[in-house]
Curated annotation (Swiss-Prot):
It holds the Pfam family Amino_oxidase. The lineage of its organism: Eukaryota, Viridiplantae, Streptophyta, Embryophyta, Tracheophyta. A motif (Microbody targeting signal) lies at residues 490-492. This is Polyamine oxidase 5. Its cofactor is FAD. Binds 1 FAD per subunit.
């Protein structure tokens, strides 16, 4: 597939020149109003296609969700720009909108989304772990992970990353840790699990470090992702509260059936619903999807990470980016993101991933907050009660059924290619469909643009309109102001 160009991608920010203004425009239904679906709809709309976007929720954004009930923006889903650099496909739009980023780390993206010196870790008795121990263990953890590359080269078959770590430690006794240092190592593993949104025994040795990582480190979206969603969605034909139940391909047309009995007909459809929804077979296909497509959906992993956001009357915690609790097992570790440092608001966000996150969803909001506060008070005995809280449930939310995709142990080599591939007039997009940047917002965005371009080319050939509805010359306003509008970064 061709990579998306900035020219075809951006929303509401173009002056376009298109031939054939009197021809009947091709029609496309985009299913899913997350950033991938909105990007696809925006791109096709800018190419003068007739585009209808159907979204099951009562809002846009999908797993990108900015909540304002605290009186400030809180992203309860995606919240970082992974790769603060011009190569990031979202960079032009973020710069143009003047959205501020708070950079939380350098380029060591796979291991950490925060620099080690920004952590304050505490043991079970509330004593802060000396920074030199945190730094030393972090360096040891990196050495252990580098040694797993040798294990990978020695084994043809895949294995869980934790198994490879055990092999490394058996071979290198000097890397083994005990006592408090061992607990800090478990906390590092906890953070690795959060990156992949799954437990370490599910993380693939062959694929854990194969992601194409952009430069520039990680940037927290201080204003949230909501302004990006609104900018891209401007003037699109959007239907909220439209849950798709069936997709029919017949006579070179695509019929999309909605839960309330309504049907929409178009020349093609782009499916951007989350991987978890596809895995649950909530949407029926007629004819059924081919086996190669079904197996790609089945073989891709889906992880879960949830947030418990807590607003307090005042700040009682140290001025660091992350507060962490170390423990003898990674599941017993925990951490809080300090939004006060980035935004000035007295907010902590507890983040839980993997099986622990699934267990959390069985609790009520109040029970979740009580548990989180009990952990916080062990770290900081003077902690006060929150005045407001928010709790996410991405795993059981019927509109998501998971947070983002992950590589399971033994993943077939061609898995992403099969998942991305179209089936007739059906095209697939979303974070799980981005080969190089799965699990990220910019990956989902880029995937939507690629699917839109593939759909445009397909319909141009099928409908015999190859000379029409082509994007000849697109002038992006951000191209004219790119030099004048740099990233707004509050921490260098």
């Amino acid at each position: 597939m061709d990579q998306p160009s900035n020219g075809f991608a951006a929303g509401g920010l173009f002056l376009r020149h298109i031939d054939g203004q009197n021809a009947s425009p091709p029609s496309v239904i985009v299913i899913g109003g997350g950033i991938s679906g909105i990007a696809a709809a925006r791109a096709l709309s800018n190419a003068s296609f007739k585009v209808t976007l159907l979204e099951s929720r009562d809002r846009l954004g999908g797993r990108v969700h900015t909540d304002y009930s605290f009186g400030c923006p809180i992203d309860m889903g995606a919240s970082w720009l992974h790769g603060v650099c011009n190569e990031n496909s979202l960079a032009p739009l973020i710069r143009l909108l003047g959205l501020r980023l708070y950079r939380t780390s350098g380029d060591n993206s796979v291991l950490y989304d925060h620099d080690l010196e920004s952590y304050a870790l505490f043991d079970k008795d509330g004593r802060q772990v000396p920074q030199e121990i945190v730094t030393k263990v972090g360096e040891t953890f990196e050495k252990i992970l580098k040694e797993t590359v040798k294990v990978r080269a020695e084994h043809e078959d895949d294995m869980p990353l934790i198994q490879a770590i055990s092999i490394v430690l058996d071979r290198n006794p000097h890397l083994k840790l005990d006592g408090l240092q061992y607990e800090v190592l478990q906390w590092c593993i906890c953070r690795l699990e959060a990156w992949f949104a799954t437990d370490v025994d599910n993380i693939s040795l062959k694929n854990w470090d194969q992601e194409h990582v952009l430069t520039g480190g990680h940037g927290l979206m201080v204003h949230g992702y909501d302004p990006v969603i609104k900018a891209l969605a401007q003037d699109l034909d959007i239907h909220l509260n439209h849950r798709v139940t069936k997709i029919i391909q017949r006579y070179n047309k695509t019929i999309v059936c909605v839960e309330d009995g309504t049907s929409f007909v178009a020349d093609a459809a782009i499916i951007t619903v989350p991987l978890g929804v596809l895995k649950a077979n909530i949407i029926k296909f007629e004819p059924e999807l081919p086996d190669w497509k079904l197996s790609s959906i089945s073989d891709l992993g889906i992880g879960i990470e949830n947030k418990i956001a807590l607003r307090f009357n005042s700040v009682f915690w140290p001025n660091v980016e992350v507060l962490g609790r170390v423990a003898p097992t990674s599941n017993a570790c925990g951490y809080f993101l300090n939004l006060h440092k980035a935004t000035g608001h007295p907010v902590l966000v507890c983040m839980v991933a993997g099986r622990f996150a699934y267990e959390f969803e069985k609790l009520s909001d109040e029970e979740s907050v009580n548990f989180v506060m009990s952990q916080l008070k062990k770290m900081l005995p003077g902690a006060t009660e929150p005045v407001q809280y928010l709790v996410s449930r991405w795993g059981t939310d019927p509109n998501s059924l998971g947070s983002y995709s992950c590589d399971l142990v033994g993943k077939p080599a061609d898995l992403y290619e099969r998942f991305c591939a179209p089936v007739g007039n059906l095209f697939f997009a979303g974070e799980a469909a981005c080969i190089d940047h799965s699990g990220s917002v910019h990956g989902a965005y880029s995937s939507g643009i690629v699917a839109a371009e593939d759909c445009r080319r397909h319909l141009s050939t099928q409908l015999g309109i190859s000379d029409l509805f082509q994007v000849g010359k697109i002038i992006m306003r951000e191209e004219m102001t790119e030099v004048m509008v740099p990233f707004q970064i509050s921490r260098l």
